Amino acid sequence: MTTTWDDWATSAEAAYEELLGRCENVAVVGLSMGGALTAYLAQRHDVAACVFINPQLIRPAKDLVEGLAALLEAGVTTIDPIAGDIKKEGVVETTYPSMPLSSIGTLFAAMAGVEDHLSSITAPTLLLSSRDDHVVPSENGDALMAHCAGPIQRVWLENSYHVATLDNDAAFLESEVLSFLERVFA
């Protein structure tokens, strides 16, 4: 069984609704692909705040999409996980043993809707971007900065790669997120 973008989005919606039933305000936070889900929720709900950490928000390059299609046509169903983009020595990211290509395809397809509606994000937004990210191009954060309709602040992470929550800037990142949320909820 393959999990799709619709499954992830439905699960995020359910979690948001469950939290909204218990909390007065809900902030959404996402790393990488989770950034797409954060945008998806913020585009559809009156979230209190958004935090994006090295988010995937825009359509992938055409050659990447075509390469994925070629692999699927050739019968390749999975690839090795995209993992380990961590600068800090000795830190290992826990991942699935492989990534199903059809699931990645549904994520790629969903990116058009996410990218096209970035301007509908009106919540206060914090964007944390690693200067040296080998997984998600910085154009994703640039697009959010250019199109987000709400107040937005970008903080650069100078000593981390893609998985910044486990990297050298993790404590700084945590402090920035907590300070931002304290200001929003003050």
Model regions: which residues?
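Catalytic nucleophile-loop/oxyanion-hole region of alpha/beta-hydrolase
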Residues: 1-22
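Gly/Ala-rich beta-loop-alpha elbow adjacent to hydrolase catalytic centers
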Residues: 30-34, 38
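Flexible "cap/lid" loop of the alpha/beta hydrolase fold
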Residues: 47-77
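Active-site nucleophile elbow and catalytic-triad environment of alpha/beta-hydrolase enzymes
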Residues: 100-117, 123
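Short beta-strand/loop motif that positions the catalytic acidic residue
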Residues: 121, 127-129, 133
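Short alpha-helix in the alpha/beta-hydrolase fold that links the catalytic acid
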Residues: 123, 137-146
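Catalytic histidine neighborhood in serine/cysteine hydrolases
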Residues: 142, 146-163
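Catalytic active-site module of serine/aspartate enzymes centered on a nucleophile-bearing elbow/loop
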Residues: 159-186
